[in-house]
């Protein structure tokens, strides 16, 4: 079993989990093909992590299965936006930690 971890990535964990659940249990080659055509920022990032996990395993992508794809919450960057009459409102910029585990056949 090989794994790849990408931490503190500037993408929403909630939106990333939707993509991560789709590829769990898939063949790594099919998962990469599926992620390539998914129009989502998180899909491009998760595809890189899956490719890294496959490279760490030392096997070909066709011989690997994505056993686990987990997206955890990272720290939230807090910013402020100036508003009318001297006020300010908050902006939350979430980060995520992405863990992908693959296993050879």
Swiss-Prot record:
Q: What GO CC terms are in its UniProt record?
A: cytosolic large ribosomal subunit
**Which Pfam families does this one have?**
Ribosomal_L22 (PF00237)
BP GO annotations:
translation
The record ties this protein, via SUPFAM superfamilies, to: Ribosomal protein L22
**Mind telling me which InterPro entries this protein's record contains?**
Ribosomal_uL22, Ribosomal_uL22_bac/chlpt-type, Ribosomal_uL22_bac/org-type, Ribosomal_uL22_sf
What keywords would UniProt list here?
Ribonucleoprotein, Ribosomal protein, RNA-binding, rRNA-binding
Q: Which CDD domains match?
A: Ribosomal_L22 (cd00336)
GO MF annotations for this entry? rRNA binding; structural constituent of ribosome
Q: Does the keyword RNA-binding apply?
A: yes
Q: What does this protein do?
A: This protein binds specifically to 23S rRNA; its binding is stimulated by other ribosomal proteins, e.g. L4, L17, and L20. It is important during the early stages of 50S assembly. It makes multiple contacts with different domains of the 23S rRNA in the assembled 50S subunit and ribosome. The globular domain of the protein is located near the polypeptide exit tunnel on the outside of the subunit, while an extended beta-hairpin is found that lines the wall of the exit tunnel in the center of the 70S ribosome.
Return the similarity comment.
Answer: Belongs to the universal ribosomal protein uL22 family.
Assembly mode: Part of the 50S ribosomal subunit.
Identification of the protein by name: Large ribosomal subunit protein uL22
From which source organism is this entry? Sulfurimonas denitrificans (strain ATCC 33889 / DSM 1251) (Thiomicrospira denitrificans (strain ATCC 33889 / DSM 1251))
């Amino acid at each position: 079993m090989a794994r790849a971890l990408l931490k503190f990535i500037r993408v929403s964990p909630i939106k990333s989990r939707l993509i991560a659940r789709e590829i769990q249990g898939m063949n790594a080659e099919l998962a990469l093909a599926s992620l390539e055509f998914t129009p989502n920022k998180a899909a491009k990032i998760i595809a890189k992590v899956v490719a890294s996990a496959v490279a760490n395993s030392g096997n070909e992508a066709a011989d690997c299965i994505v056993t686990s794809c987990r997206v955890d919450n990272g720290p939230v960057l807090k910013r402020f936006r100036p508003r009318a009459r001297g006020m300010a409102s908050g902006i939350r910029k979430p980060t995520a930690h992405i863990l992908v585990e693959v296993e050879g056949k």
